[in-house]
Each structure stands twice: as C-alpha cells, then as structure tokens.
Regions:
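N-terminal amphipathic alpha-helix/helix-capping segment at the start of soluble metabolic enzymes
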Residues: 1-38
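Active-site beta->alpha loop and helix N-cap motifs at the rims of alpha/beta catalytic domains
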Residues: 44-51, 55, 66-133
C-alpha cells in the first residue's frame, strides 16, 4: 500500500535538512508517493519547495518554455547548468535534478562524465537526468 509523505510546515523551512538520495530511496522502499515538479528559476523553486515539493527537475523543456525554441533539442548546456544553479539557490534543501540536454552526453563517456560533473559542481545539482534509447 502506498502513502503520501507528510511534509509539515516545519519540514519545509530553510532550517530543514536537505532532501537526499537516501530520503528518496527510503520513501521508495516505504511505498511513499512524493511529488517531483519542474522549475526553471529560483522563485518558482522556492514556491514549490515551500509548498511541500521535495524533488525538483530542471528540465530541458526550458528551451521551449523559457527560450521559445520549437523543441528541447535547442537547450544550450551552459544555460541548463545556469538555471539548475538558480533552482538550487531558490530551494537549497530540495533534491534538484539537472536535465542533461541533447548532445551533452552522446559523443562519448568522457564528455558525458565531464558535463555531468559540471551539473554537479557549477549547477550544484544533486543528480543529473539523461534520456537513453
């Protein structure tokens, strides 16, 4: 039986412990349901996290939603890293996943690891997401 996590107001404050991969694993083991929503900037991240959203995805859909491109294929790597850092600054205790854009991991393992590392260091992401065939 699944149940929803209970995020009380106290748990959503800036003083709360950061959401970690260990938390996500525990919630999964317990069958808990938790929200994961997309944010593209610090303000939206702050609102979502204070509303009880523990996991935030910085999606490559920002190419369409923020930059006005016709598809996600146009998401620049540096832009994605920059907005990932903005989301983490807005919600420092949320678990933030940066979405690696098209061609940022397709040309080889070395480049994929380097770009993922940039998301973790420059973008301060807790995890990276990529799409596999």
């Amino acid at each position: 039986m699944s149940h929803h996590i209970d995020t009380t107001e106290a748990e959503r404050t800036e003083d709360a412990s950061p959401v970690t991969l260990r938390d996500l694993r525990r919630w999964s083991r317990e069958g808990s349901v938790f929200p994961c929503l997309t944010a593209y900037d610090a303000t939206m991240a702050r609102w979502l996290h204070h509303s009880g959203v523990p996991v935030l995805l910085v999606g490559d859909s920002a190419a369409q939603v923020v930059l006005g491109y016709p598809s996600t294929l146009h998401a620049p790597l540096d832009f994605m890293i920059t907005i990932t850092a903005a989301v983490k600054r807005g919600a420092p205790n949320a678990f933030v996943m940066g979405d690696m854009p098209f061609m940022s991991y397709h040309l080889g393992d070395e480049e994929a690891v380097r770009n993922a590392g940039r998301f973790m260091t420059e973008g301060t992401a807790d995890a990276v997401k990529l799409e596999m065939d």
